[in-house]
UniProtKB/Swiss-Prot annotation:
Transmembrane segments: none
Protein name: Sperm-specific class P protein 32
Domain MSP: from-to ranges: 1-107
Organism listed in the record: Caenorhabditis elegans
InterPro entries associated with the record: Ig-like_fold, MSP_dom, PapD-like_sf, Sperm-specific_class_P
Record PROSITE patterns: MSP
Tissue-wise expression: Expressed at higher level in testis.
Gene name, Swiss-Prot/TrEMBL: ssp-32
SUPFAM superfamilies: PapD-like
Domain of life: Eukaryota
Region Disordered: start-end pairs: 1-20
Length: 107
């Protein structure tokens, strides 16, 4: 399982960025994929990646200028072998095991 801190973000309508930490509470390596309900106004880095067993990593959400609207980002995850090198592969194979949602607000 993966968790995200902080679990939400608020941006000005003029745009901005927010850094979040993905934490693995598993004894296994995890791959993740980030999806957005609004690809027009949000960008994330990285979109795909790995979190080592009991590890942490940071990712960034960038909001471009746009109208005030509530959105969400979903981080899907799947357990992967230690030697997996393609973070997209488990999702192409339908191996998703769970997801975490980040609520996004603008003001």
């Amino acid at each position: 399982m993966l968790t995200i801190e902080p679990p939400s973000a608020t941006f000005p309508a003029s745009g901005g960025s927010s850094t979040h930490t993905i934490t693995s509470v598993n004894e296994s390596r995890m791959a993740f994929k980030v999806k957005s309900s609004n690809n027009e106004h949000y960008r994330v880095r990285p979109v795909y990646g790995f979190v080592e067993a009991r590890g942490k990593m940071k990712f960034e959400i960038i909001r471009l200028e746009g109208p005030v609207k509530d959105d969400k980002i979903m981080l899907q995850y799947a357990e992967v072998p230690a030697d997996e090198t393609d973070a997209q592969a488990p999702f192409k194979a339908g191996a998703q095991q769970g997801d975490v949602t980040i609520l996004l607000k603008t003001n």
